[in-house]
């Protein structure tokens, strides 16, 4: 049995899932981030599955999504990368709340996410050493190279606009995994990708695995793919995530 309920932590709506009857007890805790234009409720099946396996799972609502959506879809579309940054920046305050409440068992903290959430996971892992295990589903940690084609804030078709785009997105250099791979792979890491993904190409994950391999950083990395699967989570992907955290967290 699983209990799920809504909370607001530091002004951020979250969905809280825990094994029935254990909500007030210290538990290994996973923070899960949902995808772009989605919501914490849509991805609540991750919370259910992780809670059923014995984990407390906290699903924060990304800025401009779900309960935080202002109704302006065009504005949200132009702020994908700002939302990613906000996810990463907001995580410590949420984590610290549950740590202060004594609800995290033995500092056993995991981060997980899909799509935008997978990208959030990778960016968070290289910034926050208190993360003990991380799982990225159909994500990428190479923000600057992906940003011109994945939800850029505006079309950049001239040298001037391309330069402006690069300037506007320069903040991503401090968040992406480039030059921080040792911090990404120093603890258990799961990378999952559907090979037919046409939104965030599987090559993003392949590139990461190649780069980690070149630096002999694959000892704690698990790389899983599924053929003919596009930009979506499968039942087997969810199972892989549960197995990963059950073993390493």
Please provide the spans of the model-predicted regions.
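N-terminal cap/lid segment of alpha/beta-hydrolase-fold proteins
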Residues: 1-25
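Short beta-strand element of the alpha/beta-hydrolase
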Residues: 25-35
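The serine-hydrolase catalytic nucleophile loop
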Residues: 36-48
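Conserved alpha/beta-hydrolase
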Residues: 49-73
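Alpha/beta-hydrolase active-site loop
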Residues: 78-101
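Primarily recognizes the serine-hydrolase "nucleophile elbow" in alpha/beta-hydrolase
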Residues: 94-151
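The feature captures the conserved acid-bearing segment of alpha/beta-hydrolase catalytic domains
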Residues: 145-206, 210
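C-terminal catalytic histidine-bearing segment of alpha/beta-hydrolase fold enzymes
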Residues: 206, 213-249
């Amino acid at each position: 049995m699983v209990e799920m309920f809504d909370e607001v932590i530091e002004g951020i709506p979250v969905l809280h899932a825990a094994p029935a009857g254990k909500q007030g007890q210290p538990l290994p805790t996973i923070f899960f981030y949902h995808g772009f234009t989605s919501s914490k409720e849509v991805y609540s099946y991750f919370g259910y599955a992780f809670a059923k396996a014995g984990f407390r799972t906290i699903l924060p609502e990304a800025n401009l999504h779900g309960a935080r959506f202002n109704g302006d879809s065009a504005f949200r579309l132009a702020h994908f990368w700002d939302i990613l940054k906000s996810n990463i920046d907001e995580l410590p305050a949420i984590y610290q709340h549950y740590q202060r409440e004594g609800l995290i068992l033995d500092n056993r903290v995991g981060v997980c996410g899909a799509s935008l959430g997978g990208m959030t996971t990778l960016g968070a892992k290289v910034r926050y050493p208190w993360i003990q295990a991380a799982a990225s589903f159909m994500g990428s940690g190479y923000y600057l190279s992906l940003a011109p084609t994945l939800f850029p804030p505006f079309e950049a078709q001239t040298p001037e606009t391309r330069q402006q785009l690069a300037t506007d997105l320069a903040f991503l250099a401090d968040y992406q995994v480039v030059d921080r791979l040792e911090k990404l792979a120093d603890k258990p890491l799961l990378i999952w990708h559907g090979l037919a993904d046409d939104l965030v190409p599987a090559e993003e994950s392949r590139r990461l695995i190649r780069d980690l391999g070149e630096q002999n950083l694959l000892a704690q990395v698990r790389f899983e793919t599924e053929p003919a699967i596009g930009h979506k989570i499968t039942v087997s992907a969810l199972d892989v995530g549960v197995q990963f955290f059950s073993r390493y967290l």
